[in-house]
Amino acid sequence: MIGFTCGAFDLLHAGHIVMLEESRSRCDYLIVGLQTDPTIDRPEKNKPIQSVYERFVQLDAVKYIDNIIPYDTEESLIDLLKSQHIDIRFVGEDYRDRDFTGSDLPIEVQYTSRQHSFSSSGLRKRIEENEKPH
Protein backbone atom coordinates (compact mmCIF):
# COMPACT_ATOMS: atom_id res chain seq x y z
CA MET A 1 0.00 0.00 0.00
CA ILE A 2 1.34 3.39 -1.01
CA GLY A 3 0.50 6.27 1.30
CA PHE A 4 0.73 10.01 0.70
CA THR A 5 0.71 13.09 2.87
CA CYS A 6 1.75 16.64 2.16
CA GLY A 7 2.54 20.02 3.65
CA ALA A 8 5.11 22.79 3.87
CA PHE A 9 6.86 21.17 6.86
CA ASP A 10 8.35 24.52 7.87
CA LEU A 11 10.17 24.43 11.21
CA LEU A 12 9.96 20.63 11.36
CA HIS A 13 8.76 19.73 14.85
CA ALA A 14 7.63 16.81 17.00
CA GLY A 15 4.05 17.04 15.73
CA HIS A 16 5.25 16.50 12.16
CA ILE A 17 7.26 13.46 13.23
CA VAL A 18 4.32 11.95 15.15
CA MET A 19 2.08 12.42 12.09
CA LEU A 20 4.66 10.92 9.72
CA GLU A 21 5.20 7.94 12.02
CA GLU A 22 1.45 7.33 12.26
CA SER A 23 1.04 7.65 8.49
CA ARG A 24 3.91 5.27 7.75
CA SER A 25 2.52 2.70 10.20
CA ARG A 26 -0.61 2.47 8.02
CA CYS A 27 1.13 1.87 4.67
CA ASP A 28 4.12 0.10 3.16
CA TYR A 29 5.61 3.10 1.36
CA LEU A 30 5.10 6.77 2.28
CA ILE A 31 5.38 9.59 -0.23
CA VAL A 32 5.53 13.13 1.16
CA GLY A 33 4.53 16.06 -1.01
CA LEU A 34 6.63 19.06 0.05
CA GLN A 35 4.94 22.36 -0.76
CA THR A 36 7.57 24.89 -1.77
CA ASP A 37 5.61 27.98 -0.64
CA PRO A 38 1.92 27.86 0.35
CA THR A 39 1.54 31.63 -0.18
CA ILE A 40 1.94 31.28 -3.97
CA ASP A 41 -1.76 30.58 -4.37
CA ARG A 42 -3.00 30.94 -0.78
CA PRO A 43 -1.85 34.35 0.52
CA GLU A 44 -3.54 33.79 3.88
CA LYS A 45 -0.99 31.07 4.72
CA ASN A 46 2.35 31.66 6.46
CA LYS A 47 5.37 32.07 4.20
CA PRO A 48 7.98 29.45 5.12
CA ILE A 49 10.91 30.64 7.20
CA GLN A 50 13.15 27.84 5.94
CA SER A 51 14.09 27.35 2.30
CA VAL A 52 12.62 24.40 0.43
CA TYR A 53 16.13 22.91 0.39
CA GLU A 54 16.43 23.10 4.20
CA ARG A 55 13.01 21.49 4.61
CA PHE A 56 13.86 18.78 2.06
CA VAL A 57 17.11 17.91 3.86
CA GLN A 58 15.28 17.63 7.19
CA LEU A 59 12.50 15.46 5.75
CA ASP A 60 15.04 13.29 3.95
CA ALA A 61 16.49 12.37 7.35
CA VAL A 62 13.12 11.17 8.70
CA LYS A 63 13.08 7.37 8.68
CA TYR A 64 9.31 7.15 8.10
CA ILE A 65 9.51 8.80 4.65
CA ASP A 66 10.30 6.78 1.53
CA ASN A 67 10.05 9.52 -1.11
CA ILE A 68 9.73 13.33 -1.14
CA ILE A 69 8.19 15.14 -4.10
CA PRO A 70 8.21 18.96 -4.08
CA TYR A 71 5.23 20.82 -5.55
CA ASP A 72 4.31 24.50 -5.67
CA THR A 73 0.57 25.17 -6.09
CA GLU A 74 -2.66 23.42 -5.19
CA GLU A 75 -3.11 22.72 -8.90
CA SER A 76 0.28 21.00 -9.03
CA LEU A 77 -0.77 18.99 -5.95
CA ILE A 78 -3.77 17.69 -7.93
CA ASP A 79 -1.41 16.73 -10.78
CA LEU A 80 0.89 15.00 -8.29
CA LEU A 81 -1.99 13.06 -6.72
CA LYS A 82 -3.16 11.95 -10.16
CA SER A 83 0.31 10.96 -11.40
CA GLN A 84 1.29 8.73 -8.47
CA HIS A 85 -0.29 5.36 -7.68
CA ILE A 86 -1.52 6.36 -4.23
CA ASP A 87 -3.72 3.98 -2.25
CA ILE A 88 -4.20 6.07 0.89
CA ARG A 89 -3.95 9.79 1.54
CA PHE A 90 -3.26 10.87 5.10
CA VAL A 91 -4.80 14.14 6.26
CA GLY A 92 -4.96 15.66 9.74
CA GLU A 93 -8.19 15.04 11.63
CA ASP A 94 -8.78 18.80 11.71
CA TYR A 95 -9.74 18.43 8.01
CA ARG A 96 -12.38 15.76 8.69
CA ASP A 97 -15.36 18.06 8.06
CA ARG A 98 -13.61 20.43 5.65
CA ASP A 99 -13.06 20.48 1.94
CA PHE A 100 -9.40 20.14 0.93
CA THR A 101 -7.47 19.97 -2.31
CA GLY A 102 -7.95 16.60 -3.96
CA SER A 103 -10.72 15.43 -1.63
CA ASP A 104 -12.84 14.66 -4.70
CA LEU A 105 -10.26 12.26 -6.19
CA PRO A 106 -10.81 8.49 -5.95
CA ILE A 107 -8.15 8.02 -3.26
CA GLU A 108 -9.00 6.61 0.17
CA VAL A 109 -8.56 9.27 2.87
CA GLN A 110 -7.47 8.37 6.38
CA TYR A 111 -7.23 10.97 9.13
CA THR A 112 -4.24 11.22 11.42
CA SER A 113 -4.82 12.01 15.07
CA ARG A 114 -3.83 15.30 16.62
CA GLN A 115 -3.27 14.05 20.17
CA HIS A 116 -0.57 16.63 20.80
CA SER A 117 -0.15 20.39 21.10
CA PHE A 118 2.76 20.83 18.68
CA SER A 119 2.30 23.24 15.78
CA SER A 120 4.42 25.41 13.49
CA SER A 121 2.38 28.46 14.54
CA GLY A 122 3.02 27.69 18.20
CA LEU A 123 6.72 27.20 17.51
CA ARG A 124 6.88 30.52 15.63
CA LYS A 125 5.26 32.25 18.60
CA ARG A 126 7.65 30.64 21.10
CA ILE A 127 10.65 31.69 19.01
CA GLU A 128 9.34 35.25 18.75
CA GLU A 129 8.75 35.46 22.51
CA ASN A 130 12.22 34.08 23.26
CA GLU A 131 13.82 36.68 20.98
CA LYS A 132 12.26 39.63 22.82
CA PRO A 133 14.67 41.54 25.07
CA HIS A 134 14.17 40.62 28.71
Predicted regions and their residues:
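Nucleotidyltransferase catalytic core that binds NTPs
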Residues: 1-134
